[in-house]
From Swiss-Prot:
Lineage: Bacteria, Pseudomonadati, Pseudomonadota, Gammaproteobacteria, Enterobacterales
Gene name linked to the record: esaR
Keywords: Activator, DNA-binding, Quorum sensing, Transcription, Transcription regulation
Function: Functions as a potential OhlL-responsive transcriptional regulator.
Chain segments annotated as transmembrane: none
Identification of the protein by name: Transcriptional activator protein EsaR
Location of the HTH luxR-type domain: 174-239
One function term, GO molecular function aspect: identical protein binding
GO terms (BP aspect): quorum sensing; regulation of DNA-templated transcription
Signal peptide annotation: none
DNA-binding region(s) from the entry: 198-217
Organism field: Pantoea stewartii subsp. stewartii (Erwinia stewartii)
SUPFAM superfamilies: C-terminal effector domain of the bipartite response regulators, Pheromone-binding domain of LuxR-like quorum-sensing transcription factors
Family per record: Belongs to the autoinducer-regulated transcriptional regulatory protein family.
């Protein structure tokens, strides 16, 4: 769905200018407006004042799949500061993304959350840094209602620019319906999440053990994690795993 913005720099610039104008009363802080498809989190829109190099790195590594800020937002509706305990999974280590973000002075922030009508997760993150750190943090906490309405406004502007109410709506909706996993990948991951061994999964699904391992490897790559256990945990946390058709047999 969000490829439309990647392919149309004028529309992207229009949305970015709008966001920056609305945030200017706060002193034009660094920000990120991020939208992630709940059905396929590999689909992401990022409109941000962060350095271009960091955004390219973030996209290339699909960091939204393991970003603690994103993962926390999936499970809540209220705003939160980054200094809270936002790690959802004790066996997933986020040292890579944290160490990299520090190089771009992206360390402390405040995030507002919106679960929208198109089954997407929208976030507005404001970076807190510099001499005015305390003042900005206090203001963001005090004006949560105003900031939340700004996020809603930004999200509506995004859909308006994308034309979901116009002639591009069918194509956008069709793209949004695509899931992150193929049916076979989902089936294999489902049975793995139910505690089945690779041999048991192979017997249930009628494929070879090597094919089961092949699909698990694809899932691990898509989710940007290190192993099957982490893939299962992340799939469960993000509600990406659907009951397999073979479960009804």
């Amino acid at each position: 769905m969000f490829s439309f913005f990647l392919e149309n720099q004028t529309i992207t610039d229009t949305l970015q200018t709008y966001i920056q104008r609305k945030l200017s009363p706060l002193g034009s802080p660094d920000y990120a407006y991020t939208v992630v498809s709940k059905k396929n989190p590999s689909n992401v829109l990022i409109i941000s004042s962060y350095p271009d190099e960091w955004i390219r790195l973030y996209r290339a590594n699909n960091f939204q799949l393991t970003d603690p800020v994103i993962l926390t937002a999936f499970k809540r509706t209220s705003p939160f500061a980054w200094d809270e305990n936002i790690t959802l999974m004790s066996d997933l280590r986020f040292t890579k993304i944290f160490s990299l973000s520090k190089q771009y002075n992206i360390v402390n922030g405040f995030t507002y959350v919106l679960h929208d009508h198109m089954n997407n997760l929208a976030l507005l993150s404001v970076i807190i840094k510099g001499n005015d750190q305390t003042a900005l943090e206090q203001r963001l906490a005090a004006e949560q209602g105003t900031m939340q309405m700004l996020l809603i406004d930004f999200n509506e502007q995004m859909y308006r620019l994308a034309g979901t109410e116009g002639e591009r709506a069918p194509a956008l909706n069709q793209s949004a319906d695509k899931t992150i996993f193929s049916s076979r990948e989902n089936e294999v991951l489902y049975w793995a999440s139910m505690g089945k061994t690779y041999a048991e999964i192979a017997a249930i699904t009628g494929i070879s053990v090597s094919t089961v391992k092949f699909h698990i490897k694809n899932v691990v790559v898509k989710l940007g994690v290190s192993n099957a256990r982490q893939a299962i945990r992340l799939g469960v946390e993000l509600d990406l795993i659907r009951p397999a058709a073979s479960a009804a047999r």
